Amino acid sequence: MVSHEVLWKGSAERDLKNIDPQQVPRIIKAVESLIDDPFPPQHRKLRASASDYRIRVGDYRVIYKVDTKAKVVTIHYVRHRSQAYRR
């Protein structure tokens, strides 16, 4: 399997600063797992977009986009489940 590159948007990096520090390593580990498989069994496609997906990490949601041709996973947001789907 070909690995993907993970890019963090500024918004996702800012989101990490507002999250409980004990949860951050779990979230980073989950994001790093997307390098080998950007479509893990627990991923879900978001209805509003053709290429946006989410994974669940406890009470947090990681919203990301996959470019299969360029082999890039872009992390857009990391938010609590109550805030994750609001624009």
Task: Give the positions of each predicted feature.
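A short, surface-exposed loop/turn module that caps and links secondary-structure elements
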Residues: 29-55
